[in-house]
Amino acid sequence: MKLLNEILGTKYPIIQGGMANIATGEFAAACSNAGALGLIGAGGMNVETLRENIRRCKALTDKPFGVNIMLMHPQADEFAKIVVEEGVKVVTTGAGNPGKYISMWKEAGIKVIPVVAAAVLAKHLEPLGIDAVIAEGTESGGHVGEMTTMALVPQVVDAVDVPVIAAGGIADGRQLAAAFALGACGVQVGTCLLVSEECPVHENYKAALLRAKDSDTIVTGRIGGTPVRVLKNRMSREYVRQEKAGADKMELEKYTLGSLRRAVFEGDTATGSLMAGQVAGMLHEVRPVADILDELWESGRQRMKSLGELC
């Protein structure tokens, strides 16, 4: 099995999650320079800002980087063309089927890596020509599915022949080693990078993550079919309470409209949407992204070596 770094040309078999309103060109470049595949998150951007972020990333790194496109975005068609025009080499996708773009991307030499939350979707996408698939468990922050990473990854590995990347609930070497044991060729991480020095989220957001305990995340929108994992705060608790009471979509929208931007840019930890995975309780300090990635890989490698010695 080829490791992800061999497929992507990176130092480590690690992808930085393309988090909307967070994964800027500068942040993606910092992650790429530190050994991961940095991703620009097109969610929260428009055509002009995406193009600007791609160009800024190019100016800051000579390492591989990519773009994450949420296919439900109203400008997804335009984004699909921009990555071709700007010479992006890797595209990850979520919230939809990338099928109509794949031939265009493949002709441009772009590696296409969808994010899936179920093995059946991975199996459906494989014949379309994808290069790999990210199997993301419900432990992750932001939009989530129902299956845990532990259950999802091996079933996706068994369902498809393309390389599988594990995501959701990965913040240290023990979890990285577990991902490889499940059959993954690499991992995608997001929450653990939110507390990097280079991450552009507000300091209040980082402080909230550092205070978090193991049970301090909650999933909003599960009843309405749009589940999102966030830190518990006034907004998320009230949202869940209203949702359980039968509030309609319009009533609930008043809690979430603009809430991610309030958290990321204004540091509003009361009514902002503090998207974070269940590993938030494992975060203890703000560090350079290079230190986080170096330790993640080295501790994972040592863990795998130790496990090998046990057998």
Which role does the model predict for each range below?
Residues 151-165, 171-311:
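Conserved active-site-proximal phosphate/metal-binding subdomains
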Residues 1-163:
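Active-site entrance/lid segments in N-terminal catalytic domains of soluble metabolic enzymes
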Residues 20-21, 36-47, 134-146, 170-205:
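Glycine-rich phosphate-binding active-site loops on the catalytic face of alpha/beta enzymes
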